Amino acid sequence: RNLGKVIDTLTCGFADLMGYIPLVGAPLGGAARALAHGVRVLEDGVNYATGNLPGCSFSLFLLALLSCLTVPASAYQVRNSTGLYHVTNDCPNSSIVYEAADAILHAPGCVPCVREGNASRCWVAMTPTVATRDGRLPTTQLRRHIDLLVGSATLCSALYVGDLCGSIFLVGQLFTFSPRRHWTTQGCNCSIYPGHITGHRMAWDMMMNWSPTTALVVAQLLRIPQAILDMIAGAHWGVLAGIAYFSMVGNWAKVLVVLLLFAGVDAETTVTGGSAAHGALGIASLFNQGARQNIQLINTNGSWHINSTALNCNDSLNTGW
């Protein structure tokens, strides 16, 4: 609503100036005033949708916070090497969102390649947006960062200055306040999922290629149960204060946004019932025959020869080919 007042001042002032133009002022002024009224109608619709619908009272500040993690990014990157373009999974500098001592928060669909000394090596992807140096997730600095963001959003909402804080945050997006800690390059050709390749990983990789933002949201939703336990055990006061305040005022959409922000950097993917299912899978796997080669023999002139040793589709997924 406060931003709408600024827009109304600009559009109405422009309409008044157009009306003072000699000869053509009357028609131009009328057209400009009609345009100003149209803008006002759009503002009223936005105010109704964001202020009166239950659970949808988003402030500009929270939308700005969410934008730093859900910016659509291409699932493939291209680097230029001596005039030749190569498709790579290595993150460019534009995909790096936040850097800590042992972790990098980046856009989904790539893996950071960090140069240390005279060698470049891939960091281990812990989540679609977080990579670490050695495969362990140091959450101390990332927790402090999320606590600060959510605490600031809660304070701005409680003081009814969300539009002002959101405007300041959006302007701050144009600048880099966090210094670069690592030298990221695109010379590693990292794999998004290192290790044994299974059918599930292949499907997840394809989903990240189709829609990185969808992959990000799904991964965060699956980590919410573990994130709730972590924020209580770790005493994350900024996040807890934000969830408590937004729950008391009935802004459940903001509660979900805070949970997604926290789960994106501070939990492992844990599905409810996953432990029981994993135990049942361990027992059932005892009876699996595993991957095997179906050897086909043919008889030619009284001699038997091997005709084919190719793996079928399921066997190829189990063996990792």
UniProtKB/Swiss-Prot annotation:
Keywords recorded for this protein, A-Z: Apoptosis, Capsid protein, Clathrin-mediated endocytosis of virus by host, Fusion of virus membrane with host endosomal membrane, Fusion of virus membrane with host membrane, Glycoprotein, Host cytoplasm, Host endoplasmic reticulum, Host lipid droplet, Host membrane, Host mitochondrion, Host nucleus, Host-virus interaction, Inhibition of host innate immune response by virus, Interferon antiviral system evasion, Membrane, Oncogene, Ribonucleoprotein, RNA-binding, Transmembrane, Transmembrane helix, Ubl conjugation, Viral attachment to host cell, Viral envelope protein, Viral immunoevasion, Viral nucleoprotein, Viral penetration into host cytoplasm, Virion, Virus endocytosis by host, Virus entry into host cell
A GO term for molecular function: structural molecule activity
Gene Ontology annotations of biological process type: clathrin-dependent endocytosis of virus by host cell; fusion of virus membrane with host endosome membrane; symbiont-mediated suppression of host innate immune response; virion attachment to host cell
Transmembrane regions: 53-73, 243-263
Region (Important for lipid droplets localization), start-end ranges: 48-51
Disulfide-bonded cysteines: none
Topological region Cytoplasmic: 1-52
Site (Cleavage): residue numbering on this chain: 61-62, 75-76, 267-268
Span list, region Important for fusion: 149-180
Name of the protein in its database record: Genome polyprotein
GO cellular component terms listed in the entry, alphabetical order: host cell endoplasmic reticulum membrane; host cell lipid droplet; host cell mitochondrial membrane; host cell nucleus; membrane; ribonucleoprotein complex; viral envelope; viral nucleocapsid
Key word Acyltransferase present: no
Region (HVR1): 268-294
Signal peptide from the UniProt entry: none
Propeptide regions on this chain: 62-75
Glycosylation sites recorded in the entry for this protein: 80, 93, 118, 189, 301, 307, 314
Organism: Hepatitis C virus (isolate TH)
Similarity annotation: Belongs to the hepacivirus polyprotein family.
Lumenal side: 74-242, 264-321
